[in-house]
Amino acid sequence: MAIGNPEVATMGKENTEAESSNGNESQLSSDLTKSLDLAEVKEDEKDNNQEEEDGLKAEASTKKKKKKSKSKKKKSSLQQTDPPSIPVLELFPSGDFPQGEIQQYNDDNLWRTTSEEKREMERLQKPIYNSLRQAAEVHRQVRKYMRSILKPGMLMIDLCETLENTVRKLISENGLQAGIAFPTGCSLNNVAAHWTPNSGDKTVLQYDDVMKLDFGTHIDGHIVDSAFTVAFNPMFDPLLAASRDATYTGIKEAGVDVRLCDVGAAVQEVMESYEVEINGKVYQVKSIRNLNGHSIGRYQIHAEKSVPNVRGGEQTKMEEGELYAIETFGSTGKGYVREDLECSHYMKNYDVGHVPLRLPRAKQLLATINKNFSTLAFCRRYLDRLGETKYLMALKNLCDSGIIEPCPPVCDVKGSYISQFEHTILLRPTCKEIISKGDDY
């Protein structure tokens, strides 16, 4: 049996111990590496999970926002139908209606724009202003629709009934609280105003007609009166431009403390600067001297003051808070109108007191008029619509008694043509507002 060298054995033992220690160290380092790797993997997984959660939350919040924005869009996307059928109140649920065009007073009244007292007065009058603006918004939407459907060949009575029924829908007609302020005027050619077809009328709108479409709306008796002229033949364009320009001149001149005669002088100067050629003959456009603009009262279309369309009128001044219809008429005829044709417009006398009536039928008709129109103008078609029959004798009796005032059509000479434009303006303490102004005129 061989015996080994002790030094060699010692060295081998040392080597074995060194190898084992090295092995342990490498084992520890590999274990540490694995644990670090596992920690990193877990951290990555945690980060990924967090990112996924954040993504899901963001996606959910985006969906909610989209839903909210969609619901908001749905709420605010209510628009007028074609033909118009949605009441204007539903289109403006806040109850605030669009302002008309604002014009500042001339420099001599500039102090009004800085007066706190004047602005406070405006705030107190806001409910009245809002009623006027609501009536004006109905007027704008109705005339926009009517312009889109007007064409030669239409029966005038169909035209009027379409317009009036649209007004009734959009204004949410409610007796004397909201509705039509006066009958639709659709006067043709040499007829300047106050013509609307009676029941059974077969008049047809022609290509060469010049039609004045004049209608009014009201909320609680606060009336908006506005008119424009329609002509399909471009030959009449200068005639329309004359009255349109003259109307805006009158509006520009109007204001607090302005004399009515000064407005008339400015209107005439502009109107009579125009000429129109019709079928080879040139006519100077004349301002009709016996038709005027007018102040407007509550349930009173023609109040106390008249705004002339020619120079030399009244020295009376316009006053703060007043409502005016500035309307001008340009004619190729004599520039003077007379009553003619069958009467269709009627209106209860605003200042009439108690008048004893003998005819029972007249009393009954007056009760109908008081209930449905009060002192607002009406026409025979409106009485027909209410179911009144065989009323002409009773109506004549009311006219003869001075209770009802007939308003027959007014005409220039035959063969002449007349144009008209009209706006309602409000003389506010700080500025004037063209209540009925729209995109069309």
From Swiss-Prot:
Residues bound to a divalent metal cation 1: 214, 225, 422
PROSITE patterns documented for this protein: MAP_2 (PS01202)
Residues where substrate binds: 194, 302
Biased composition (Polar residues): 18-33
Annotated GO MF terms: initiator methionyl aminopeptidase activity; metal ion binding; metalloaminopeptidase activity
Residues binding a divalent metal cation 2, per UniProt: 225, 294, 327, 422
Main localization of the protein described in the UniProt heading: cytoplasm
Cofactors named for this entry: Co(2+); Zn(2+); Mn(2+); Fe(2+)
Record localization: Cytoplasm
Parts of the chain that traverse the membrane: none
Biological processes annotated in GO: N-terminal protein amino acid modification; proteolysis
EC number: 3.4.11.18
Reaction(s) the record says it catalyses: Release of N-terminal amino acids, preferentially methionine, from peptides and arylamides
Functional description taken from the UniProt entry: Cotranslationally removes the N-terminal methionine from nascent proteins. The N-terminal methionine is often cleaved when the second residue in the primary sequence is small and uncharged (Met-Ala-, Cys, Gly, Pro, Ser, Thr, or Val).
NCBIfam families: met_pdase_II
Family stated for the protein in its record: Belongs to the peptidase M24A family. Methionine aminopeptidase eukaryotic type 2 subfamily.
Protein name per its UniProtKB record: Methionine aminopeptidase 2A
Species of the source: Arabidopsis thaliana (Mouse-ear cress)
